[in-house]
């Protein structure tokens, strides 16, 4: 009876909710991704208590929760009931800083007590990873200096265990609160973000919370699996797109040294992006006074929940919500409340009048030369890509162009791939197969179809081929050089082994027969006919078995990828699709014809691309090898070539 009962709703994708206890109204809440807590003490009975939650799909919050993802309604994070003693620790902020010498920790505990506080005491015990006590004594509000501290970073994610003990006036223990903290110093120095005095480069990824069976209701297994993938592929940073994640994820990032941009649950792109055009006449929240308290409250909820996590280096005001006085107020709140972290927001690129919102220049999908142009302008702010390498379908090419900027420009401080995991749901298709379904696969219209399939892993967690590039380019330069050297040595050894084996093969002179319509080549166990009129080899027999159906032709088209279609590439390169059909044959030329080697060239014109041509060169060797070279004389005046192949 001396306890106060509270109900914590971990999170409800609610946009809006009402709570009742035993038929009595308790409270109301919005914001789908930060906890809502209610005091149930006045409403509970000894037994037979009933708690009801009414969740609404539509509310005013819908305007600012317009993230690109599947829409669900209901409870998707833990719900719990807990009791608090009459006097308890209502809030804890263990401000763990680091002095310039990088060995002296500066711990400033800020506590808030609730209840009858007369005569109570709070003590702190801090131990290192080996369990050795660094401090044991009262909490006075003063900063505690600690010698021999190991700084927290990606390479050394050292955490210290704090234990706060609250006793009442009679000396009876009321609460013991454990917490793991990391000592680090994150700051802007001469326009460069530095951690513990060293420039930091984010080899990052955006991460939605997702499971193909459970949607956003992920669990510890999902998070541990994701963390293992990040560590195995040299990813050192995560942006929580576009809402705060479950608290366990922050614990894992603390333990594994993963840097975090912690993002407020705010996105309103539908209020100012009109079919790709920018039209902010009724942007929400913008500078509308009725929205200011709402968005600042979301920033406050996130900060108060996550402020003790060493992994959180940067607060983000949200995503794709244009700019205005309301988001500026969020930044002002972050700066005033927590000077130890920086503030991020990309949307000011569309409205430079509010450039003060962000401490860094953040852009999405900027091209390498655009980034270079910014960095050459001697900017005040460093540059990051909050989204890049849009990994939709078969993609992620060109990552090297971005990663190498980090070596050239100290103010280029990395980026966050879009994104970690495809958002898709297991379902049974019309053929009775269990497959991953995307937008439109569930009968809904209108839809964005597979636009949620942007991950470097599939929805079931399997790595995509693109992950090989991520792992390579996110490795350190030294590790890349070592891998390149090992690959080169292995390739050279293989070449030597194959060459020796090939040279040891007995050769048999080729027999060449020139006819009016064909050129014949005969070896020990094979024979080949090149057709002058047929524009290539008409027959290839090995041990009497025919291997050709018809003469190969040069091909210039391939299936377009998702990102091809997104940037209009198929339309720009459509002439090459026609070239596949309408290529013209311009004749055959025998370049060499002897007992050791026969080399034949076939020439082709490409009428749909004026001035373009191609050739196929076939080389037959006495050892029995056939080599085919497809040659396209490159001209940068031609349209982009999708591919060249047979």
Identify the meaning behind each predicted range.
Residues 227-230, 237-460, 465, 469:
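Substrate-binding/catalytic cleft of secreted carbohydrate-active enzymes
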